[in-house]
Structures are given as structure tokens and as C-alpha cells.
């Protein structure tokens, strides 16, 4: 046993780490990629995770050695220092080793890729909301089938890999948020509330098949070749076709909401919004994703800088803290 192994350290969850902290604790490596610096030297680009969140990390020295040791999805005891990089916390890793039988202070429950909130309660509220506001028999049947087929996966799924709601249960939070906004805004413009509710439920459900989280978060074959918009459309058609005499006009309207929700073809929509309901769903989807990005920028700031670095998705820097 080397000196690194003998060091006794208190639990250091990622949420609590600040720039300047020296760390010797267990983390799950969610992603690991070997890259090169501008000078051509190898380094490892990592994403560390625990039940409180994620943090980017780098290994600058002995990258080739560690690239043979480290596997995405596994838990390691990691030594390093948290630093500020462009207004965000990032760990520079100096040592890492695999977890062994003697690591009794490693609680594997801290590294399960599961929602950090009561996702079962939120899932129940989501379907209760739909039940309270849907009156058309075809839509009620459709949502009942959805709940049985896709409810469990919706409860656990990531909303994205990196940009917004990029955590277990993120897709459920995103979906529920849009449903609530539909109820608030659709009546103001005299839009078809029930159509929008069902469109919101289905618009991103393909993400349950676009990503997998075990052993590590990555894109599936279907996700890479088809994308979540096409998968969502396929999942809707599968359920719709099980319902006798489902109105074709209603089916087409829902399909349009799914395929147009990214707004522009260059952003992944097969079609642009051509109905007010489709346009509103696009705007609500965009709004909720952007609000989550603001939230993440502020949560992941190092607590010292007033503004973040330029954020590509937002097209600006984010005010992190008041002076």
C-alpha cells in the first residue's frame, strides 16, 4: 500500500468543492477521452460524477499510462486539485487508482447515475396533470399507453449529454416544465391545449433511446444514426397505431409538433413550425433549455468571477454573482 492509499480523507462530494481545494476521494469517471495539446503532447479529458453533479477534469502528466488504466463508468480514488478554468471549476488529476475491497469508505450509492430528486413523485405529478386536462378519448388512451411503455424510462433519462438538463431525470424535469408552461400560455392565445400537452410529452421521448448510461453515458447506435426527433416520431406512431380509429388529422398535428420542435432545419428539425401550436412548443422547448443553461452556469461557477466565459448556446457571457 502506497502513501496515496494510506491517506484518510473526509467525503468530498463534487457539489461542495471550490477552486483551490486539494482532493483525495472517490469519483466515477463518466467520460474519458485522450487528446493532444497544441504542442502535440497527450492529455486526458475526463468528466467526473457523483450523486451531487459532474465536474470536468484533466490529466496532463502520464496520460498514456492512465489511459490504459481508466475506463468510463468505473469508480476510482482520485487525487487532484480543483482550479478555476474560464470561470468554472475543473480538477487537475495527479493520481488515480481503481477501487478495491479495502476501500470500505467508498459508498457506491454516491455514484449511481440516478435522479438526485424525487423523480417518482414528479412522474406522478406529470401524468396527473395530463389526466386533469385531457378530454379527448384518443389522447387519453395514447397517454395511458405512453405511461405504461415509456414512463419508467422517462423517469430516469438524461435531457441531453451536455447542453441542458444533462443529468439523470433531466428529461422528466424538462418535459414537466414545458407541460406547466403550456397550461399557462396556450389559453392566452386560444391554442389547442390538449394537442400541445401531448406534443410536449412526446417531443423528446426519443432521448430515452438516444443515450445509454451504462456502463457510461454515450450515444446509442440508433441515437447516432437517427437522432431523437426521428426516434420520438417512431415511438408516437407505434403507440398511435395500437388505438383503433385514432383521428388522422390529430395524428398529423402531433407528428408536426414532434418534427418541428427544433424550429429550424439547420438545428435538426425535419420541418419548420407551420402551426401556432408547433411554434409555441418550439419556443417553450428553447426557453426551458436556456433557463437550465443559465442555472448550470451559475451553479458551476467558482464563486470568484462576476461573469462566465462566453457560452456558445446562449451566445453571451452569464452574470454569475452580484458584486
Describe the residue ranges of each PLM region.
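Divalent metal-coordination and catalytic microenvironments
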Residues: 27, 73, 178, 285
